[in-house]
Amino acid sequence: MKDIIIASFYKFIPLNDFESLREPILTKMHEIGIKGTIILAHEGVNGGFAGNREQMNVFYDYLRSDSRFADLHFKETYDNKNPFDKAKVKLRKEIVTMGVQKVDPSYNTGTYLSPEEWHQFIQDPNVILLDTRNDYEYELGTFKNAINPDIENFREFPDYVQRNLIDKKDKKIAMFCTGGIRCEKTTAYMKEQGFQHVYQLHDGILNYLESIPESESLWEGKCFVFDDRVAVDQKLDRVYPQLPQDYKYEREQK
């Protein structure tokens, strides 16, 4: 039985006091025994952390005790050991760095599709299926017929759109990422640019893998995750027990 719960979450919401939230959250993580990384910025909060069920429930309640976080949704996966080695709370300019100002995912994002809706939608040959992740993530696994933007980091995505998609504003574009947060920004950016039909996989690839039977799945390969599991398969089991050196630098920049 897998006793460790791994939770990922995010919320785009203005946090004028985000700097003052760091120490209380970090103190609570140490107090409970939670390990993981939480990122705070003016635009909101993003993170992943892990512990046993009792620890996680206590920390969920703590975070939700702030009225701004009362509706936080935690996406859970499970493992036999904690994939994080310590507790960290970081202050950043963005909770996921795209480097484009005046993009507000708190109100202007793509249309959410459930895993079941997504499964049907991306089989339409008229849909442009776009992987918003980095090139090494794409190489590990992606959806059948997905386009690889061939980017080394998320900051390069806007340039990809300007070079390759700007003349396709009337097309249906389906976008996906690991857990959903990058798609919040990419779809918001594209709507700001005038794209009319933008869709995103709700809660990302991990939600699809959990929801769609492997025998029917349109996912091919493994899914990279930003913790010491490195990647998971279609059953959400870890693929590599140790972290390859190739991915260390990217993880440390998160």
UniProtKB/Swiss-Prot annotation:
Keywords on record: Oxidoreductase, tRNA processing
Residue ranges occupied by any Rhodanese domain in the UniProt entry: 123-217
Residues annotated as the enzyme's active site: C177 (cysteine persulfide intermediate)
GO molecular function, one term: oxidoreductase activity, acting on paired donors, with incorporation or reduction of molecular oxygen
Catalytic activity annotation: uridine(34) in tRNA + AH2 + O2 = 5-hydroxyuridine(34) in tRNA + A + H2O
Disulphide connectivity of cysteines: none
InterPro entries the record matches: Rhodanese-like_dom, Rhodanese-like_dom_sf, TrhO, TRHO_N
Coiled-coil segments on the chain, per record: none
GO biological process terms on file: tRNA modification
EC number per UniProt: 1.14.-.-
NCBIfam families associated with the record: PRK00142.1-3, PRK00142.1-4
Function according to Swiss-Prot or TrEMBL: Catalyzes oxygen-dependent 5-hydroxyuridine (ho5U) modification at position 34 in tRNAs.
Family to which this protein belongs: Belongs to the TrhO family.
Stated name of the protein: tRNA uridine(34) hydroxylase
Organism: Legionella pneumophila (strain Paris)
